[in-house]
Amino acid sequence: MTFEAKYLGSNGWLIKFDKTNLIIDPWLTGDLIFPPGEWFFKGSLDNEILIEEDINIILLTQGLPDHCHVPSLKKFKKNIDIICPNSAKGILEKLGFTSIKVLKPKEKIMQKDLEIEATAGAPVPQIENGYIVKDDKGKGFYIEPH
């Protein structure tokens, strides 16, 4: 079984299985600014992060900017499969994404060759998502960024 995990900084991960590559909470380009503005929080990347692998799934744990980073999401094809909590859905729809699957804690979905189960995540203020991800051989990982 191939399983590689590459930390991308902030909350981001690139996960490679035998047949499927997924990216979690990508911040790949541009500044990270939390509302109400730069005076509250602004993070900057030293360099843009380039992803050479074909990404099959985007997995978002929250709808907040450090998990659902709009400038980074704009780099992906609009028909890529995205799994997310409800807090990210409206942002993704405004960006034109067409394959959005919203999961609530305890819900599962089969996506490509992966089983993805949402778990209760951080309450910021509503409950966001963690995930248990397993391949077709039952190997996998758990993520909740807090």
Residue ranges and their predicted role:
Residues T2-E4, F76-I82, K139-F141:
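Short active-site oxyanion
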Residues L8-D18, M110-H146:
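Catalytic core of the metallo-beta-lactamase
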Residues G9-S10, P85-I91, K104-E107:
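Short, polar loop motifs at secondary-structure junctions
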Residues T20, K78-D81, F97:
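A short helix->loop->beta-strand "cap" motif at the edges of active sites that frequently abuts
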Residues T20-L59, P71-K75:
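Pre-active-site segment of Zn-dependent metallo-hydrolases
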Residues I24-D25, D54-C68, I83-N86, F141-H146:
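Active-site neighborhood of phospho(di)ester-bond hydrolases with catalytic His/Asp-centered motifs
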Residues D31, G63-C68, K89-I91, E107-M110, ...:
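Active-site environment of divalent metal-dependent phosphoester hydrolases
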Residues L92-V102:
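Helix-loop-beta element that forms the nucleotide-linked donor phosphate-binding surface
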